[in-house]
A protein has these predicted regions:
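Glycine-rich phosphate-binding loops of nucleotide-dependent enzymes
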Residues: 1-196
Length: 196
């Protein structure tokens, strides 16, 4: 039991969009892209909260609408460029390889400009090459974007390779907290994962 605070504000009872406005974005274990939409349009979905035009501007295609849409497209292209996916901007998201779809989902979450990025088993179903690319993506988010990343993951090499602090759960109970070296040498962790 406990509570989650973002900048001192409780998240309990908040709707998803309210938590997002507090600066939290997340991805899910199962990829949730708009597979028929282009890669760039998937990222633009994450930017919708930042658009500053009203319904009339949108319906009538007034100048403010075009100005905001241009900014949105530029930001989406910037993210694609940063993560080396600009060549896929107009490709349907569903046609991307699995690892690229996962990175796209993370980029869409980043488009919301979060303070905290929650990643739920991002390496699930990935091959070693895709996991290596994902590791670099997460490291870059942490270092270059200065965003806190909360990672839920079973791939221990990924966790040990990028996390500064680790909490290990066994059947829903925290059995250890510490640095990668502390966790690697913790007898309770070794017993839980390798058995006696």
């Amino acid at each position: 039991r406990g509570s989650i605070l973002i900048d001192g504000m409780p998240t309990a009872g908040k709707k998803t969009y309210q938590v997002n406005r507090m600066g939290v974005a997340r991805t899910f274990q199962n990829i949730r892209l708009f597979k028929e939409l282009s890669v760039i349009d998937n990222i633009k979905v994450g930017l919708h909260e930042s658009l500053r035009y009203d319904l009339a501007s949108s319906l009538l295609r007034l100048p403010n609408y075009w100005k905001e849409e241009k900014k949105c497209t530029e930001r989406a292209l910037e993210l694609l460029d940063i993560f080396h996916m600009a060549d896929f901007a107009n490709v349907p998201a569903g046609s991307l390889p699995y690892g690229a779809q996962r990175r796209l989902e993370i980029m869409r979450a980043l488009a919301t400009s979060p303070k905290l990025l929650l990643l739920d088993e991002p390496a699930a179903g990935m091959n070693p090459s895709e996991t290596a690319e994902l590791t670099e993506t997460i490291r870059r988010i942490r270092d270059d974007f200065n965003i806190a990343v909360l990672l839920i993951e079973h791939d221990m090499s990924l966790v040990m390779g990028i996390c500064e602090g680790i909490a290990v759960l066994n059947f829903g109970r925290i059995i250890a907290k510490g640095t990668p070296d502390e966790i690697r040498n913790n007898p309770q962790v070794i017993e839980a994962y390798l058995g006696k």
